[in-house]
Swiss-Prot record:
Disulfide bonds join C3-C21, C14-C38, C42-C53, C54-C59. One of its GO terms (molecular function) is toxin activity. This is Cytotoxin 7. The keyword Secreted applies.
């Protein structure tokens, strides 16, 4: 699986066991992601932070 880094022009290949890509946003500003990468389990959203997870190459 390949996941985009913070700047989508760059990406990395995920290590074994991390088979989801994610994008993290601040709830107050959903237009600008603050973090992207590989993850094993999609975190729950909170009052401040929203996560979007997916499982295809560079989907984040």
């Amino acid at each position: 699986l390949k996941c985009n880094k913070l700047i989508p022009l760059a990406y990395k290949t995920c290590p074994a066991g991390k088979d989801l890509c994610y994008k993290m946003y601040m709830v107050s500003n959903k237009t600008v992601p603050v973090k992207r990468g590989c993850i094993d389990v999609c975190p729950k959203n909170s009052l401040l932070v929203k996560y979007e997870c997916c499982n295809t190459d560079r989907c984040n």
